């Protein structure tokens, strides 16, 4: 079991401080297999190590004295189906001191997930690129289709203004059908949709936290009027690493094939090299990597990710 290390020196304040953590379902929600959908509930272990100038060390570890709640804005979430977010349930200051957590529950000490704790050497996933949409059409009354102009992996960041309780739904797809609606049959049982409920306080900005999608097109519903292209940005998410290689030739077809490979490879770096970023699979199959790993190494500095996975 890998753990992350962070230097939080610059975030410490004089006086009292607070530690706040948000847990998503992650890989506890499984690939679609008969009879197995959830392996466990989200859990975490954490400790803050404080080193004083006089050499003293203090460790503050997670235990049953910590407080928890499931009443925050993030609802249903997993990487296959998307995320539901109700902005009306936001708790300003929940991860700062002071904050009234008297209605929160006490944390429970639970069993370890198994395995041995060891430091993760590779860097985490982050926003590595952005994509501006190129078009928006109305495929049916109140149904808008956003075209990112590029098949990408990540999520959609949006700016929106409306009334409290307005419910916006975003459905993601790689292709369109002949009638202009999104094609989702290739996703199989993955819903690949995000839901955002407005709090109604002027302009709101949002992107999900615990999901990602493989898509070019986004179906938008629940909007009071046709949204603007400037309201959206595609954020490309994959494991942070350097791009170390490139290929450019005099043949546009070869260049396009290379770019397709480039986008496809980095879109499948999700804490491990996966087989696909859109349907109900997204697994780290050995066969896929046996074929592609050598070629990938000429483009990306990916050795730490592969070391973690293997």
Predicted regions: what they are:
Residues 1-279, 287-288, 304-309:
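Extracellular/oxidizing-compartment recognition motifs
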Residues 223, 291-302:
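Well-ordered alpha-helical scaffold segments within catalytic/enzyme domains
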